[in-house]
Amino acid sequence: MRICGIKLTHDGAIALIEDGRLVFCIEQEKQDNNRRYQTIDNLDAIVTALAEHGLNPSDVDQFVIDGWDGEIESRFQVLSGAAPVTLTGAPYVERHPDGLLDSLDGSGLILDDRVLSYKSYPHVTGHVASAYCTSPFAKAGEAAFCLVWGGCIFPRLYHVDGHGARFLESLFPMIGQAYAAAGHYFGPYKQPSRAGWDLGVAGKLMAYIALSSIDEDIVAVFEELYEEHFSGDAERACRYRANINDAESSLIAVHDFFDASVVRLEDKAPENVLASFHSFLELLLVREMALAMQRHSLPGPRNLCIAGGCGLNIKWNSALRETGLFDAVWVPPFPNDSGSAIGAACSAMAAHEGFVPLEWSVYSGPALKNGDAPPGWEAAPCSILELATILASNKPVVFLAGRAELGPRALGGRSILAAATSPQMKDYLNEVKFREHFRPVAPICLEDLAPDIFSPGTPDPYMLFDHQTRPEWKDKIPAVVHLDGSARLQTISRSSEHAVTELLIEYEKLTGIPLLCNTSANLHGRGFFPDAAAACEWGRIDHVWCNGVLFTKERVAELAPVGVADNMKMSTCPR
């Protein structure tokens, strides 16, 4: 059975599952240098994605559209070719505790001039299904709790097993968007008005708070205002909780909360305010999760899946894991809406077969497009060993291999790789990518050696937990050590068949260092490079390696290694 999952709104994507196996997931931002969080505005994108894999719409048994904003149903205005189309979808959240798999049956999905029927499941259903079905718990036939938190919903706790899923409770009345909203009131991303949201702010705040310290007085202010605005018995808080299905009302309440916070905290350093708010939410999350586990004592292993945009917060993920409440914690590489097309397809699979495991690979995104070297570049075959030698000479390389990784983080398929041994390399990479100076660069490390370098250094193939750099390694790999000593580590097993694994092995043989800097290969504000030509046209890194071919700028004869002053003279990073 072929099931095609579709996410139309931000982080638009098309995913195809065939007989329990993920065939592909095409996130629109990873096509043609599209903007981050690209929507699907034209249904022709679905036809194109299928055609690229030798299929047409008639080959699909079921189309599934991810639900969206709305208490009873959602609406989508799109095009099919040049014709406007209105589609109806399921709401954001299920309407009753056992209603995760209640579908809306729709028609009017026009693909290749054919009018097709479709199903739609609540948006949150997709998060639960994608997190659980890709988890090791599903594969082992074990039940799991599932935490979904993001957007305009409270943190929602579910229990899932192979037979079904049930909503248990909301942990506390704070929407996931509140974390990003804090950045619009304090710090470098402060905005003069309530209008507009930067979907990337939350990740930037996690980096920025490394400049700060937690102030318990500030935390106390947030606790007081939280009770007044959200959790207490006052009329304002009760009204807020009564309107939880109204995204606009929830956002207004969050803005009011931060307006009051600004008045109370105007004399405090903004970086300390943001760090303290992060700490306040982390403590709240851990405390309320512990209480929920006392209320829901269920037989079997205590496993936890985490989904929703807040699942990208590596510090909160680690805090939950470190509580000891759970035997194991799983976060998929796409906990945010980048996984919603997969989630929509998994929802339909669950409706047919139960919450069964999905066979999948993180490298199931778009394939690299073929193309010649643009003018000014030379192309030549290049082995992995030769590439490792270039990296060992302190020259960064755009590394493009195989199909793109799923989710928002570069995992070695669409990466800029570099030696981590130079203290200037982090600044250099941030400069060429137009990123703020405080942004970290992640290490990609051989899994078996990660515990020697990082604490805990446990397997982390998708960069979703927090690690500290061990003191004896900080001076050896300064480019991947964040301001607070942490590292957003990606581990990769020596048994992996991905090309980046062989590269790490060869680089370790040359240098004794089993890791490299790893940051995403993309235009500023855009998705991953779709091909080598796009990386060459960008041109801010002089070497581009793509599936065994090295593209080199013709003007590059013998550049000084990074760290030499003349090589650091580049356009100023926006602040």
From Swiss-Prot:
GO terms for biological process: biosynthetic process. Its EC number is 2.1.3.-. It is an enzyme of class 2 (transferase). GO terms for molecular function: transferase activity. The keyword Transferase applies. SUPFAM superfamilies: Actin-like ATPase domain (SSF53067). It holds the Pfam family Carbam_trans_N. Keywords: Nodulation, Plasmid, Transferase. Signal peptide: none annotated. InterPro entries: ATPase_NBD, Carbam_trans_C, Carbam_trans_C_sf, Carbtransf_dom, NodU/CmcH_Carbamoyltrnsfr, Nodul_NodU. CDD domains: ASKHA_NBD_NodU_N. It comes from the Bacteria. Involved in 6-O-carbamoylation of Nod-factors. NCBIfam families: nodul_NodU. Belongs to the NodU/CmcH family. PANTHER family: NODULATION PROTEIN U. This is Nodulation protein U. It comes from Rhizobium tropici. The gene is nodU.
